């Protein structure tokens, strides 16, 4: 449980800092060495905040500028293929 507490405190500290921070040495040296880090000149370590979640898909502009009757014709796409529903 002690490691979990340390992790929570670190997360809080990291949130108070800017999104990109240069570090003197890696927080987890074992993991850094597995990724190719060596403690000698020429290696720099940064902590970078990464946004969580999936890919943000851009909203098509067409839906903003279409009149409401036409908007009914446009249906959300399924598996990337756009489906048009025509009123009769």
Swiss-Prot record:
- What Pfam families does this protein's entry cite? Ribosomal_L15e
User: Do you know which SMART domains this protein is assigned to?
Assistant: Ribosomal_L15e (SM01384)
Q: Tell me the leader sequence span.
A: none
| Protein origin, superkingdom | Eukaryota
GO cellular component terms?
A: ribonucleoprotein complex; ribosome
Note the coiled coil stretches, chain numbering: none
What are the alphabetically sorted keywords of the record? Answer: Ribonucleoprotein, Ribosomal protein
Q: What InterPro entries does the annotation carry?
A: Rbsml_eL15_core_dom_sf, Ribosomal_eL15, Ribosomal_eL15_CS, Ribosomal_uL23/eL15/eS24_sf
Q: Does the keyword Nucleotide-binding apply?
A: no
Q: What GO molecular function annotations does the UniProt record carry, in alphabetical order?
A: mRNA binding; structural constituent of ribosome
Give the UniProt family note: Belongs to the eukaryotic ribosomal protein eL15 family.
Tell me what this protein is called: Large ribosomal subunit protein eL15
Native organism is: Brassica napus (Rape)
Q: Which gene encodes it?
A: RPL15
């Amino acid at each position: 449980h002690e490691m979990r507490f340390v992790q929570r405190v670190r997360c809080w500290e990291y949130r108070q800092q800017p999104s990109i921070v240069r570090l003197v040495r890696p927080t987890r040296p074992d993991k850094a060495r597995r990724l190719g880090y060596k403690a000698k000149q020429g290696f720099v370590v940064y902590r970078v905040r990464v946004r969580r979640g999936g890919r943000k898909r851009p909203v098509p502009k067409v839906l903003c500028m279409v009149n409401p009757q036409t908007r009914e014709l446009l249906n959300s796409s399924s598996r990337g293929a756009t489906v048009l529903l025509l009123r009769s």
